[in-house]
Regions:
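Structural detector of well-ordered beta-strand residues that form the stable sheet scaffold
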Residues: 37, 62, 83, 139-140, ...
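Conserved PLP-anchoring active-site segment centered on the Schiff-base-forming lysine
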Residues: 47-105, 112-114
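Short glycine/serine/threonine/alanine-rich loop segments
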Residues: 33, 80, 137
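Active-site phosphate-binding strand-loop segment of PLP-dependent enzymes
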Residues: 90-166
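N-terminal "arm"/small-domain region of PLP-dependent enzymes with the aminotransferase-like
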Residues: 1-13
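Phosphate-binding glycine-rich loop
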Residues: 13-60, 74-76, 84-86, 154
């Protein structure tokens, strides 16, 4: 490990270097997904996900209040409006019933749902994805606390349109 770190420090390629490419390939293979992009931090990953989906001023993003500040910071950074919904008392993960209620009652056009997986437990993505499909909304999974978990042999990273981790 020390030799690998020294190699990165010696060649000065912190961005787009061979180690980053290897990391992205390994991450994709581990999560059984097609692509991975290394970012400097989880906040930047969330911002890039929102930008990739062309989310900005006038758009709403449904998420939860029980999260690290980066979730809301990313939404506001692109000019979108956070639309907060309640979580399950038992898991603190987003409640899909509240998501659908928020979509129907929102004053802004909802363009994405951003579940935040907590304590190693992925959100209820099957239900969330059904709602997203019904309303033609994208799902951005924040898997900073669940990466490595799986449900029915499907790895976190493969449940949403875009998943971020840090």
């Amino acid at each position: 490990l020390d030799a690998r770190i020294k190699s990165v420090l010696d060649n000065g390629q912190y961005i787009l270097g061979k180690e980053v490419n290897l990391f992205e390939e390994n991450l994709s293979q581990f999560a059984d997904i097609k692509y991975s992009i290394g970012c400097s931090n989880g906040t930047d990953a969330l911002i890039l996900a929102l930008m990739a989906l062309d989310i900005g001023p006038g758009d709403g993003v449904i998420t939860v209040p029980f999260t690290y500040i980066a979730t809301l910071e990313a939404i506001v950074s692109v000019g979108a409006t956070p639309v907060l919904v309640d979580v399950y008392d038992s898991t603190f993960n987003i409640n899909p019933e509240e998501v659908e209620r928020a979509i129907n009652n929102s004053k802004v056009k909802i363009k994405a749902i951003m579940p935040v997986d907590l304590f190693g437990l992925p959100a209820r993505y099957r239900m969330i994805n059904e709602i997203a499909k019904k309303y033609d909304i994208k799902v951005i999974g924040d898997a900073a606390q669940s990466f490595g978990a799986s449900i029915n042999n499907q790895k976190v990273g493969s449940f949403a349109d875009i998943t971020t981790t840090s």
